[in-house]
Amino acid sequence: MAIVVVGMLDEREEALTIILDRIRQRGHRTCLIDISVGAGAIVPALQPDVTCQELAELAKERAGLAVGQGVTPNSVVTEGLKAKIHDLYGCGQLEGMVAITGMTGALISLPAMKELPFGVPKLLISGATGQPVHAAKFGDYFARRDITVMHTVVDTVGMNPLVRSLALNGADAISGMVEHYSHGNVAMGCQQDASAVGRLSSHCAYRISHRLECFGVSHNERNGIHFGDCNRHGTGGCRDK
């Protein structure tokens, strides 16, 4: 199994190199996926395990998408990345996913992260998500998925002490999440019948939850979260541990 590292090599090769090296130093295998769409200014020397061309081929094969006639490179790479992440996880080759991006890369990476089940470590390192003007673009991902975000404050293109620190912290974060993640600690693939309880009062909810616990029923409270999104991947209704 490997930690999947995602980013645009023609923009963030240096930061990606640091992340890869640090993850490997901690004893994990890596799988680098390039999501470049031709907007970067450098010609990278680092070779990815999965190229953006391979993602484009996957998008065409699985979804019939190809650049042209209103279909953008961003859409093609997004669809290809979703398919690749789905395949890697389905084959038992993915144990975590980290992406270091700007705005475009975040919007390409998040749909793939959203496809991963509850509990699987997923980390987005980006400064784009902290901008209030863009909040609506990310609501569907963060409200319904356990995606961890490291807000970078500064851009991560190029290299300086700040970017280096962010890359190292991000690599240590995803490594630590993977090291302590256990399928036995999360109700993965354990479908159970359950009752849904709607409520308006916290006091009432606490009383009901206490009574349920007396009967040995595991429960969870959520504010406006669609449980169907969690159950869709066999997470047993996102039950507590």
Where are these regions (language model features)?
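Segments that form or flank anion-binding pockets
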Residues: 22, 32, 37, 45-52, ...
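Glycine-rich phosphate/diphosphate-binding loop of Rossmann-like nucleotide-binding domains
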Residues: 12-24, 31-32, 37-50, 172-238
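N-terminal phosphate-binding or glycine-rich loops at protein starts, especially the Walker A/P-loop
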Residues: 1-41, 96, 102-124, 203-206
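Phosphate/nucleotide-donor binding subsite
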Residues: 43-93
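Short, acidic/small-residue loops that bind anionic groups at enzyme active sites
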Residues: 108-138, 148-151, 203-206, 224-228
